[in-house]
Structures are given as structure tokens and as C-alpha cells.
């Protein structure tokens, strides 16, 4: 009488097939994880740039106190969260441009404050060599890699 169950060869073949399928799926999992981080990077850059532009518009329309020679861009990212006083308002209400500074999803150290995970470009620095300065004209990621589209992350 034949015993019921799997033979050793059937188990080995099954394990081998599962191993091949798993190894074929791993690159797809990594690719999807990278795609998700890149999507988050796009969204974070858009949020920050929109807040910087809103601050600049408020400054240009006379709602933000500026000194002679100021560019009208925020002095740092934290100002966008902390807010500035609307000098045209009789009640001196505060204007806020961000709820919080988003983290750079490509930044490797989770212990660093979110505002410090971004590279800052001042209004006076050229696009080819972004440098921090008296204001924040633009932000960029400090990641060195290239995206799935072949463009360096720093150029996004």
C-alpha cells in the first residue's frame, strides 16, 4: 500500500519553483519602492516650492515686512511654518504658509530635522551652483542618485 503525502523530490521541486518566483519578484519590489520614494519627493518639492512662492507673493503685495534690498523670499524654511505678521491687517494676524516642513524622502538620516534635509538655494546663487544665502529661493534634494527617468535627483 502506498503512503499518502509528498515525496522528497516533489518538495524540492516546489521549493525551487518558489525560490525562482521570489527572486524574479524582488527587482519589481525594489523598483516599486523607488518609484514611491520618487513620487513622495516630487510631492514634497511641489509643497515647499508653492509655499515659497506664496511667501514671495505676500511680500510683493506688501503683506510681509521687508527691509530695503530684501528679495522677498523667506529667510529660512521654518518661517513658512512659524508664520509672519500680515502688516496690512489691522488686527496684525499671522500668515502661515506650511503646516510643517516635509522631510526629504531620499535623506538617509531620520534623526535630522526635516528642514535640514533639504539643500537651499538663495536668490543670488546661479542655478548651476546652488548655494545657501540670506533667503530661500528654491529647495533641492541632497540625494546623489538618478531617478527612474534618468534625471539626477538634484535637478528635480
Where are the regions a protein language model picked out?
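Preference for short coil/turn "hinge" residues that link or interrupt alpha-helices
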Residues: 19, 26, 34, 91-94, ...
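N-terminal single-pass transmembrane signal-anchor helix
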Residues: 2-29
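Conserved short-loop catalytic and cofactor-binding motifs
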Residues: 29, 36, 65-68
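Low-complexity, acidic interaction segments enriched in glycine
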Residues: 53-156
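Membrane-proximal N-terminal amphipathic helix
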Residues: 33-60, 72
Amino acid at each position: 500500500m502506498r503512503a499518502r503525502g509528498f515525496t522528497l523530490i516533489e518538495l524540492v521541486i516546489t521549493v525551487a519553483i518558489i525560490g525562482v518566483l521570489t527572486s524574479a519578484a524582488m527587482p519589481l519590489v525594489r523598483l516599486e519602492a523607488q518609484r514611491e520614494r520618487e513620487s513622495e519627493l516630487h510631492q514634497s518639492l511641489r509643497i515647499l516650492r508653492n509655499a515659497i512662492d506664496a511667501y514671495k507673493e505676500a511680500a510683493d503685495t506688501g503683506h510681509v515686512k521687508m527691509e530695503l534690498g530684501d528679495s522677498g523670499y523667506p529667510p529660512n524654511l521654518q518661517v513658512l511654518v512659524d508664520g509672519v505678521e500680515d502688516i496690512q491687517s489691522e488686527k496684525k494676524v499671522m500668515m502661515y504658509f506650511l503646516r510643517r516642513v516635509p522631510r526629504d524622502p531620499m535623506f538617509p538620516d531620520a534623526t535630522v530635522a526635516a528642514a535640514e534635509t533639504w539643500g537651499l538655494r538663495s536668490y543670488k546663487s546661479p542655478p548651476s551652483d546652488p548655494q545657501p544665502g540670506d533667503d530661500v529661493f528654491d529647495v533641492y534634494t541632497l540625494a546623489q542618485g538618478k531617478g527612474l527617468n534618468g534625471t539626477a535627483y538634484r535637478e528635480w
